[in-house]
Structures are given as structure tokens and as C-alpha cells.
Amino acid sequence: MKSLLLLVLISICWADHLSDNYTLDHDRAIHIQAENGPHLLVEAEQAKVFSHRGGNVTLPCKFYRDPTAFGSGIHKIRIKWTKLTSDYLKEVDVFVSMGYHKKTYGGYQGRVFLKGGSDSDASLVITDLTLEDYGRYKCEVIEGLEDDTVVVALDLQGVVFPYFPRLGRYNLNFHEAQQACLDQDAVIASFDQLYDAWRGGLDWCNAGWLSDGSVQYPITKPREPCGGQNTVPGVRNYGFWDKDKSRYDVFCFTSNFNGRFYYLIHPTKLTYDEAVQACLNDGAQIAKVGQIFAAWKILGYDRCDAGWLADGSVRYPISRPRRRCSPTEAAVRFVGFPDKKHKLYGVYCFRAYN
């Protein structure tokens, strides 16, 4: 017991001797690090930025370092941008930078770079925006053991529209719904996009898939059997369903296009096959559903002539309601999916700009 007590006393004296040899400055460095917390701060001037398909955008991100912090400036700064999936379960790599080393991933190659406005600027520039670029992006800055992140949302100007194929309503599983939107120059809409469309007046009584795998529908005028007679307006949520087996419609989203949408002046009405050929003869292609909605919503296109579209449907866009032309509201009117051999309609064409 005496030997153990002597060992403890010697250890205490040796520790006191060591503490006398350490400078006050060293003690302060440790004290500041403990009390002041992290020495790397990442911020975004805007939580959300807006653009459109084909445009350019800067996702803001700046970082601030404490130059007095122990170890500051020793490590290279690593900047990493990722995109969050709509269900927030995964992150998709977009861009990584460390010193002179830079790497771009996937479809972002050749379209993204750091703004580089200053040594503390981690803002990311995305050029030639696509519909798939919409979403939330995370900026992460790492220096040694210190790191911080910020999330920036990229919103696109555009229009949400409900869609179902020739087979009729409630015939698409989730994967087919995704492809159906792509076939119409669109992507499957997010909940935020549907919610914004509902706030803008979209009222649709058929449930459709959204990008997060949920099934919902927007009601501005509750009625039976659309949301219930005595209920409040809102986006009705059916929840999450089996993506392979469950079948619903889909809500698609599209944005500006780089081309010309127009109704082809032709001496006669056309069958579907004749309509396709007529657009080709005019140096164009038969238009898609997403293009007629974009022309109507974004450009204010108005035409009171029913015309064929690429999916075999017949529609016409009205931005100025009037007698015999959607008198009650501005809308893209849906005639249906008639027999493709019927020679009763004109055609809407789309000519892309190079």
C-alpha cells in the first residue's frame, strides 16, 4: 500500500512539473477549440434558386474558416457537391474539388464548374439545365477533421400536367409512369411541383404517381367523389404503393423548350399517320404532350383547333377562354384517343433549334 501511495505522489508531482513547462498560448489554443466549437462554417446566401430548362444557374455556397484555430491552413480544402434523391435516402455525386484536382460525375460532365469568385467561394455553376437537374443539392466543405454542409434547392420554371396513355386511366405502374413522362418530353413531377401547381389552381380528380413513389392528386374544388363534398381543398395523399404492381396515372413536369411549337396549316384534315408525315415534310416532328403544355403555360399559346400529338391523343391549347373554345377556363383541352385512321383533325408540330 505504501509503495502504491508513493507512486501516486510521484505521478502528481511529475504532472505538475510538465504543466509548468507548457506555455499559456498552447493552453489557450486548446481552450478556444473546445469552447468556440467548429472552426469551419458553410452558408448559402439563398436557400432556393430559380431557372429553366436550357438555362444556367449558380448554386450559392461559401465557407468561412477561423484562421486562429489550431491546425487551420494545414489541410487542403475539399469541396463536394451531391444531389439528394427525392426520397432523401441517397446522394448522387455531382462534383468534387481538392486543390487542382477536380472530378465531375454522370450527366453533369462538361456542364458544371466552381464559380471561384474568391478563395472561400464554393458555389457551383450548372449550365444547359435539364429537367432532371431539378432538386436539392448539398454543398460539403471539408478541412482536415472539420466539415460543414448546406443544402440548396434548384427550382425550374415549368408546368405540371396529369397524364394517362391510350390504354386508359390507372394503367401505369411507377416505372411505366416514369417512362410515359419521358416519352412526352417531361419527367415525373415531385410533390413540391404538384403542390405549387395546386396552389396555382390545378384541380384533378385522378390519383397519379409522383417522383418519391407516392400517389396523390390535387383538389381545389372538393366534391363527390373528388376529395369529398364537405372537405377542404388540398393535395390528397394515397400514400406509397407497390411500384411494380400498383397502377395509377402520373403527374409529369416539363419546362421551356429550345424550338418552335406550332399548328400546321394544311389543306385537309389528317389521319394520325398523315399527321406524322406532314410534320416531317415541314422539317419538324409531331409534337409531344409536354410540348403543348409548355407552349400553353409558358408562352401563352392559343389555338382553337384540335390536333394530333405524338402519343395518338388529340388536344388543343386555350389561353384566352371564349365561346366554343374552353369558355370557362384556360386549359389544354383533351379530345381523346380517337381511332388513328379517322381523318378528322389537324396536327401540332415541333421544330427543334440547333
UniProtKB/Swiss-Prot annotation:
<dbReference type="InterPro" id="IPR013783">
    <property type="entry name" value="Ig-like_fold"/>
</dbReference>
<keyword id="KW-1015">Disulfide bond</keyword>
<dbReference type="Pfam" id="PF07686">
    <property type="entry name" value="V-set"/>
</dbReference>
<feature type="propeptide">
    <location>
        <begin position="1"/>
        <end position="15"/>
    </location>
</feature>
<dbReference type="InterPro" id="IPR016187">
    <property type="entry name" value="CTDL_fold"/>
</dbReference>
<dbReference type="InterPro" id="IPR007110">
    <property type="entry name" value="Ig-like_dom"/>
</dbReference>
<dbReference type="Pfam" id="PF00193">
    <property type="entry name" value="Xlink"/>
</dbReference>
<dbReference type="InterPro" id="IPR016186">
    <property type="entry name" value="C-type_lectin-like/link_sf"/>
</dbReference>
<keyword id="KW-0325">Glycoprotein</keyword>
<dbReference type="GO" id="GO:0005615">
    <property type="term" value="C:extracellular space"/>
</dbReference>
<dbReference type="InterPro" id="IPR013106">
    <property type="entry name" value="Ig_V-set"/>
</dbReference>
<feature type="disulfide bond">
    <location>
        <begin position="181"/>
        <end position="252"/>
    </location>
</feature>
<dbReference type="InterPro" id="IPR003599">
    <property type="entry name" value="Ig_sub"/>
</dbReference>
<dbReference type="InterPro" id="IPR036179">
    <property type="entry name" value="Ig-like_dom_sf"/>
</dbReference>
<dbReference type="GO" id="GO:0045202">
    <property type="term" value="C:synapse"/>
</dbReference>
<dbReference type="GO" id="GO:0007417">
    <property type="term" value="P:central nervous system development"/>
</dbReference>
<feature type="glycosylation site" description="N-linked (GlcNAc...) asparagine">
    <location>
        <position position="21"/>
    </location>
</feature>
<dbReference type="GO" id="GO:0072534">
    <property type="term" value="C:perineuronal net"/>
</dbReference>
<feature type="disulfide bond">
    <location>
        <begin position="304"/>
        <end position="325"/>
    </location>
</feature>
<dbReference type="GO" id="GO:0005540">
    <property type="term" value="F:hyaluronic acid binding"/>
</dbReference>
<feature type="disulfide bond">
    <location>
        <begin position="205"/>
        <end position="226"/>
    </location>
</feature>
<dbReference type="GO" id="GO:0007155">
    <property type="term" value="P:cell adhesion"/>
</dbReference>
<dbReference type="GO" id="GO:0062023">
    <property type="term" value="C:collagen-containing extracellular matrix"/>
</dbReference>
<dbReference type="GO" id="GO:0001501">
    <property type="term" value="P:skeletal system development"/>
</dbReference>
<keyword id="KW-0272">Extracellular matrix</keyword>
<feature type="disulfide bond">
    <location>
        <begin position="279"/>
        <end position="349"/>
    </location>
</feature>
<feature type="glycosylation site" description="N-linked (GlcNAc...) asparagine">
    <location>
        <position position="56"/>
    </location>
</feature>
<dbReference type="InterPro" id="IPR050691">
    <property type="entry name" value="Hyaluronan_bind_Proteoglycan"/>
</dbReference>
<feature type="domain" description="Link 1">
    <location>
        <begin position="159"/>
        <end position="254"/>
    </location>
</feature>
<dbReference type="GO" id="GO:0031012">
    <property type="term" value="C:extracellular matrix"/>
</dbReference>
<dbReference type="InterPro" id="IPR000538">
    <property type="entry name" value="Link_dom"/>
</dbReference>
<keyword id="KW-0964">Secreted</keyword>
<feature type="domain" description="Ig-like V-type">
    <location>
        <begin position="38"/>
        <end position="152"/>
    </location>
</feature>
<feature type="disulfide bond">
    <location>
        <begin position="61"/>
        <end position="139"/>
    </location>
</feature>
<protein>
    <recommendedName>
        <fullName>Hyaluronan and proteoglycan link protein 1</fullName>
    </recommendedName>
</protein>
<comment type="function">
    <text>Stabilizes the aggregates of proteoglycan monomers with hyaluronic acid in the extracellular cartilage matrix.</text>
</comment>
<keyword id="KW-0677">Repeat</keyword>
<keyword id="KW-0393">Immunoglobulin domain</keyword>
<keyword id="KW-0373">Hyaluronic acid</keyword>
<comment type="similarity">
    <text>Belongs to the HAPLN family.</text>
</comment>
<dbReference type="GO" id="GO:0005576">
    <property type="term" value="C:extracellular region"/>
</dbReference>
<feature type="domain" description="Link 2">
    <location>
        <begin position="259"/>
        <end position="351"/>
    </location>
</feature>
